[in-house]
């Protein structure tokens, strides 16, 4: 049986989730790019109570994803501009450094908690610390997790029943499942 994630590492992912949600909420309020969050989920994010946002931050998986395996669009963030770009850059750098550190500590936990691929972890483990600031300037480096499951974001932002939250967690941790299957199964749980 694989080792259970360290609570310290899980707490760290929860902190990163809080920062990511705060960035997304600010971006949604100002009608800026929400890093791939579906428009319906943007509205739900703005309407979510602080308690629900905290519950979402406690999700046992990163709510963001690093796109190290994907081709970059070429758009870069200018951290010296401050404001939005500065906040986006800081968030990206923090997540990137955390992913690098986690992938060096435990590939199992990096895959489980952050959804990092083997290729991404190899790249991060071999990357000098001095390369991180330049990589963090790529605007599409950090995006919302579960991009193909917009319905999952809606449910995560609305559902507070423990049994439904548990099922959402299981769905999110099994990205290889048929994408429509979980939606049908989740609908059976709804009142």
Walk through the language-model features, giving the residues of each.
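Extended, low-complexity, amphipathic alpha-helical coiled-coil/linker regions that act as scaffolds
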Residues: 2-10, 120-127, 131-159
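Membrane-interacting alpha-helical segments
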Residues: 5-14, 77-94, 143-153
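N-terminal interaction modules that seed assembly of large macromolecular complexes
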Residues: 23-66
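Long, compositionally biased
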Residues: 56-81, 138-177
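Long, low-complexity acidic/proline-rich regions
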Residues: 180-191
């Amino acid at each position: 049986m694989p080792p259970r994630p360290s609570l310290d590492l899980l707490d760290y992912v929860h902190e990163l989730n809080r920062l990511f949600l705060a960035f997304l909420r600010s971006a949604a309020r100002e009608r800026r790019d929400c890093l791939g969050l579906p428009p319906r989920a943007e509205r739900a994010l703005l309407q979510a109570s602080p308690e629900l946002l905290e519950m979402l931050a406690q999700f046992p998986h990163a709510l963001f994803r690093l796109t190290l395996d994907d081709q970059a669009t070429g758009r870069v963030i200018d951290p010296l501009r401050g404001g939005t770009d500065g906040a986006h850059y800081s968030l990206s750098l923090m997540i990137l450094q955390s992913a690098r550190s986690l992938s060096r500590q435990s590939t199992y936990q990096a895959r489980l908690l952050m959804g990092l691929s083997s290729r991404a972890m190899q790249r991060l483990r071999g990357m000098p610390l001095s390369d991180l600031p330049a990589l963090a300037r790529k605007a599409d480096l950090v995006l919302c997790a579960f991009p193909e499951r917009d319905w999952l974001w809606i449910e995560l932002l609305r559902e507070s029943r423990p049994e439904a939250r548990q099922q959402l967690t299981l769905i999110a941790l099994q990205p290889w499942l048929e994408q429509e299957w979980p939606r049908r199964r989740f609908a059976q749980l709804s009142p």
